[in-house]
């Protein structure tokens, strides 16, 4: 039998903030009722609450099917919360996946939109959490990620020069 995340990490808590497909919202409400005290779902958006979540969380799970830019992962990194994202659009561009051989990365990612790959990314993140040295390094790298216009403008300037 394959061990599920909640069995392997029975002290983990999960907080969901946001909205989406109605079937997923219903699933989260049912899971909240089933796992009282371990899972909480806030369907909708609340700016003040979102900043409390960013500040208090260790990880941000963003399994988006499509995400042209995404700000949540960048805000989370600034707070020191490591994103776990699906490799799409702006999420792929802004989150550097953890490399266990070099120790580099600003979060965790998975390629395909399926539960198996998402679970594997979550398990890798949770294994890193158990190692304070690795976790501290990842948090620092995430907090130091540069999303400024300075970097973007340099890249555009180089592109324009190349085109000339």
Language model features with spans:
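Short alpha-helical
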Residues: 22-23, 48, 90, 116, ...
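Classical protein tyrosine phosphatase
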Residues: 6-8, 85
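Nucleotide-activated donor-binding/catalytic signature segment of Leloir-type glycosyltransferases, i.e.
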Residues: 10-52
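Short coil/turn segments at secondary-structure boundaries
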Residues: 42-45, 136-139, 155-156
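C-terminal alpha-helical cap of glycosyltransferases
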Residues: 149-164
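Short, structurally constrained coil/turn elements
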Residues: 8, 35, 101-103
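Short, small-residue-biased leader/transition segments that mark boundaries at the very start
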Residues: 1-5
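Catalytic binding pocket for nucleotide-activated donors in carbohydrate/polymer assembly enzymes
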Residues: 52-139, 143-144
């Amino acid at each position: 039998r394959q061990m599920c995340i909640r069995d392997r990490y029975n002290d983990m808590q999960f907080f969901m903030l946001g909205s989406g497909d109605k079937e997923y919202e219903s699933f989260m409400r049912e899971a909240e009722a089933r796992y009282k005290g371990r899972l909480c779902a806030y369907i909708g958006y609340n700016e003040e609450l979102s900043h409390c979540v960013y500040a208090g969380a260790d990880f941000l799970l963003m399994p988006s099917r499509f995400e042209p830019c995404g700000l949540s992962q960048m805000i989370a990194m600034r707070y020191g919360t490591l994103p776990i994202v699906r490799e799409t659009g702006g999420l792929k561009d802004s989150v550097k996946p953890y490399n266990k051989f070099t120790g580099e990365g600003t979060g965790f990612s998975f390629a395909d939109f399926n539960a198996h790959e998402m679970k594997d990314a979550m398990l890798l993140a949770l294994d890193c959490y158990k190692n304070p040295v690795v976790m501290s390094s990842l948090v620092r790298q995430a907090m130091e990620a540069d999303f400024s216009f300075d970097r973007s403008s340099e890249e555009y300037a180089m592109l324009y020069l190349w085109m000339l």
